[in-house]
Regions:
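N-terminal single-pass transmembrane signal-anchor helix
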Residues: 1-49
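Alpha-helical protein-protein interaction elements
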Residues: 21-24, 47-48, 54, 128, ...
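Membrane-proximal N-terminal amphipathic helix
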Residues: 34-64, 70-73
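Periplasmic/extracellular, small/polar-rich flexible segments of pilin-like filament-forming proteins
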Residues: 57-161
């Protein structure tokens, strides 16, 4: 007797293997998508990082002036565009905050194609000039601790942790 084709058990094994691979690959791909969207924010913030570093080198301190109460005034003093003009496919705005040179990156909504764990959340770039040169680190919130209502730390780029 000459059999051609696959038996039912062979087909079931192949389907099970594909299911296991998909169960591992799909969440990893979703993490990859979220991380690339956050990386766009880091890239868009590079102009603000440079402007704040130049301001610090010229004035010996970060922009922390009470007379510059609005984001537009702070951006003008730094020579940056309006916060909402510094945007991208996933990033709503990049803003120089009042707090000692901090930069806040805010993401668009799910309706704009942003990953659900990134949508409408923000992260901060916090400068450290204690060793003569400026280094930047990322944080989820003002305290640096990440909570469920903020961007999860696993999505922050490893280059700024």
């Amino acid at each position: 007797m000459n059999h051609k084709g696959f038996t039912l058990i062979e087909l079931m094994i192949v389907v099970a293997i594909i299911g296991i691979l998909a169960a591992v690959a799909i969440p990893q791909y979703q993490n990859y998508v979220a991380r690339t969207q956050v990386a766009e924010g880091l890239s868009l913030a590079s102009g603000a990082k440079t402007a704040l570093a130049e301001y610090y080198n010229t004035n010996g301190e970060f922009l922390n002036n009470a007379s510059l109460s609005g984001a537009a005034a702070r951006h003008e003093a730094l020579g940056l565009a309006e916060p909402t003009d510094i945007s991208g496919k996933y990033v709503m705005k990049v803003k120089a905050a009042k707090n000692d040179g901090m930069i806040v990156v805010t993401f668009k909504s799910v309706a704009d194609g942003v990953h659900k764990d990134v949508a409408e959340k923000e992260f901060r770039l916090i400068p450290d000039a204690s060793e003569g040169s400026i280094s930047w680190r990322c944080a989820c919130g003002l305290s640096g601790a990440c909570t469920s209502s903020q961007l999860l730390e696993k999505y922050l780029p490893s280059s700024c942790l």
